[in-house]
């Protein structure tokens, strides 16, 4: 969030951005703990709260002691195992479906597994569900995580030049498209498979794939893949804890401190933050586990659009306009936050689709931020230009 300070000359905006990111990460880490632990609990009979505590403690320990380097390597190893495992699961699933992949594509076409019956391609009302709004909303959510989420951005800083960064981004994009395709095919494949076979009694809405892994895959591979899912969740947790610690130390503590913090002091603060935030995320995850979440996928995407949408709106305001200033950006941030809280908690869920959250946040940021900045400049006689490299107009 150093960018916000550079672009708008405001420590306050940098701190606000960091606080919003930390809120997002706590919610994200909580859902990441909740999902695999609910699945393993239903399959093993172990209390879900105990599994959440164990997962959280392990993630806290190696985030606390290992730092970013350990996080990156565990991410790579566990991610590789998970990628290979789910790809194998897809091929194994296809081999045991009567008709193979052709049956899956038939389900796409005839059983509304590609588009729901009541889901139009386009709806002029952007507050309602449509394929267009899902694509645009998901696109802005993804853009928000790549532009304004410290856990993603900190990976960029590990590269040594833009050539390697571009290569990393292209590889990431290709793998993301591949793994998303694999999971969507698995989802429809499971629907077809359980039309042809009995559904295990333990399988709930968010647990069908895990039930398939446990009851249908070869025994040795079942244990490996379930362990990989659990480990990958721990790895993602440690990434979140590490990024929260870095953001708190550099974007909040260092900005608010009257004297410069030594490297040793920053490290110690980061470790304490990892511990405190980790414990808090464990508590929130236990609340989710006992709160009857209907669809974790929809809950998380709604939460992501709610929080990251506000952040990405501020980043877009800064990067794509020259007129935006501290006053306008701060007012836009506050207005977008107020509007989104109002929509989330005071508007019926069926009136506004979760995929519109980020679109609304960005629109409010621009509609409020640009006029407010122009009025402020006119009143104050401010003719200052943005710092070099902070907008698309000053990047050369």
What is the predicted role of each segment?
Residues 1-396:
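Membrane-embedded helix-loop-helix hairpins and adjacent transmembrane boundary segments
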